A protein has these predicted regions:
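C-terminal accessory "lid"/substrate-recognition subdomains
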Residues: 1-89, 128
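Short hydrophobic segments within beta-strands
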Residues: 7-9, 94-96, 125
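Short leucine-rich amphipathic alpha-helical surface patches
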Residues: 74-81, 95-99, 113
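Catalytic cysteine-centered active loop of the rhodanese-like fold, especially the PTP/DSP P-loop
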Residues: 87-110
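Conserved helicase motor "Helicase C" RecA-like lobe of SF1/SF2 P-loop NTPases
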Residues: 107-116, 120
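Short beta-strand-centered segment that lines the nucleotide-binding/catalytic pocket of NTP-utilizing
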Residues: 118-129
Length: 129
């Protein structure tokens, strides 16, 4: 079975998570080009799992376009991982504080993979919330 470890992280506070498997790496996606909801007072104490932040990112950003592209990349990788009997894939999403955009993106990818693949186990970790 393929285990996909998904992380959200902060470039500012702790950097890219280390892959603890023998593979030594994975995909890293930078969400900092998406408008930061944390710049608005009403979102400062919320995170990418909160409804208000989700609604904001759904309606006021290019997040879905970015995620659609990422889903295509990950689908291609997953197929190759299946063919080659690989057992671990690591995918990380970073933003400035690791609270809004990266959390949202990691949650969306986790949901996408869980709904699309019954033969994948996902492990989701938010390093800054």
């Amino acid at each position: 079975m393929l285990t996909v470890k998904i992380f959200s992280f902060s470039y500012l506070y702790n950097g890219i998570p280390k892959d603890e498997t023998p593979n030594g790496g994975g995909f890293v996606f930078d969400c900092r080009f998406i408008y930061n909801p944390g710049k608005k007072d009403e979102f400062k104490n919320l995170n990418g799992k909160d409804d208000a932040v989700i609604k904001f990112l759904d309606e006021n950003s290019d997040m879905q376009n970015m995620l659609d592209d990422i889903f295509d990349i990950i689908d291609s990788a997953v197929q190759v991982y299946f063919e080659r009997n690989f057992t671990n894939l690591m995918i990380s999403f970073g933003c400035t504080g690791g609270q809004h955009r990266s959390v949202y993106a990691a949650e969306k990818l986790n949901d996408y993979l869980a709904n699309k693949y019954s033969n994948i186990k996902t492990e989701l970790t938010h390093t800054n919330i």
